[in-house]
Curated annotation (Swiss-Prot):
Organism: Nitratidesulfovibrio vulgaris (strain DP4) (Desulfovibrio vulgaris)
Record-stated family: Belongs to the MnmA/TRMU family.
Pfam family, one: tRNA_Me_trans
Residues reported in the UniProt entry to bind ATP: A6, M7, S8, G9, G10, T11, D12, S13, G114
Region entry Interaction with tRNA, spans: 137-139, 292-293
Protein name (database record): tRNA-specific 2-thiouridylase MnmA
Compartments (UniProt record): Cytoplasm
Site (Interaction with tRNA): H115, Q324
Gene: mnmA
CC per GO annotation: cytoplasm
EC assignment: 2.8.1.13
Reaction catalyzed: S-sulfanyl-L-cysteinyl-[protein] + uridine(34) in tRNA + AH2 + ATP = 2-thiouridine(34) in tRNA + L-cysteinyl-[protein] + A + AMP + diphosphate + H(+)
Cysteine disulfide partners in this protein: C90-C187
Amino acid sequence: MTIAVAMSGGTDSLFALVLLKEQGQQVCGLHARFIPPTGHDPVPDIRAMCDRLGVDLHVVDLTEAFEEHVVRPFMEDYMVGRTPNPCARCNATMKFGLLADAAAHVGAVHLATGHYARLLRHPRWGTVLQRGVDPAKDQSYFLSLVPHARLEKAVFPLGNWRKEAVRGELARRSIVPPLPSESQEICFVPDDDYRAFLKNRRVRLPGPGPIVTTRGRKIGSHAGLWQYTEGQRKGLGIAWHEPLYVVGKDMENNMLLVGGREALASPGCVAEEVNLLVPYEDWPAEVAVRIRYRQQPLSARVTLRDGRLYARFREPQPPAARGQVLAVYDMEHHVLGGGVILGPLP
């Protein structure tokens, strides 16, 4: 039984390959080109490393599909005022979608990645996604949109590892990753500057408009709604008698809505594009949710109605950004499901 390991050239995917090989698994490397090389092409270095480890490497070109399924929706989301999460979309459509298909095409039964998350077997639910043990690197949030059937074929060797230990074990083996530095937040956005990326792509974005308080008072002008995210404080460019936060975006009237800290209190959010990883009838009444990465889970009650998730927080929270992911957990850190945030509770 062959396991294909998605090889980016970085520390995590390389150690995932090393671990599986040392466990006696039959493995091969699989590298996907998601974006055209703009500088140094990592493939020769990845191939050399695989040769050193005695592993075959397969390279698949997915640049056109990545543009269609990840980059284009990313740009379209900003055009309508959303704050997209391209990594979650990439996991669902590319890594565990088309790349997993490519793994099957080369004869692999499973696809392993360097994600910091765990997969467990449950007597009723089958494969269950669970948070990784390293709280600083846990990536279960980004995996909550991956269909259950795809997770059944996934392997996460690093789920029980911490990043510092991974680096140390590679060093102990005298293995240097081809790309030893941490990858940037969004792989296709140079320097993580999404504003420059959108401008370079000549995306038609909403222009300047008024900044209005929650009481209806105009207090300034914004540079374009696409440049702001719900809950944002910095970058408003307004001197005011109290700190101001973005509390909403009125796309129809091109208005940026701001208010003080008290205006941030949101009772919950609604999510669409729902992905159930555990049958909804098995969800507990009280769950934990995350509405942004690196956030401590929030106690909430979540209902599924008409294909949408309605999350009501136990304590009011800053508003959830439209386009981000709502990930739902039980108290044992199993991921019950996820969705794309549509807006606040009605």
